[in-house]
């Protein structure tokens, strides 16, 4: 059970598997499992699914899950999530910490790839739009879960979660 805002797991996979550890910036499947056990969603949406960790865990736990990602053709900045969910899970890039389009996947940069936004301010603006769009897919009483970390550049800390619009 998730009992705090800080999650720790000594092993990446403890009786559950998912996604690809080779995908830069992914999260451990035990985090998805703990969140599902805490919230008990019947339907999950993951509009920034990356290698599919959340969907893999949902499937193993018998939870319906819709997944999309920019590398699959779904653009959270302009596309509507096609389901209504009890839990929308968003794990965005941390600005340009890992550049995705044209680097991790694909041959070309994508214009709405948040990891390629030219500056931190425009990244935060785009991130806020993505979160707003994700929120629109929630069922009444649903939860929007956002996994985000801080960014440090040239000795300066950028606390992404503090800078997001709530």
Regions found by a protein language model. Give the residues of each.
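Class I S-adenosyl-L-methionine-dependent methyltransferase catalytic core
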Residues: 1-166
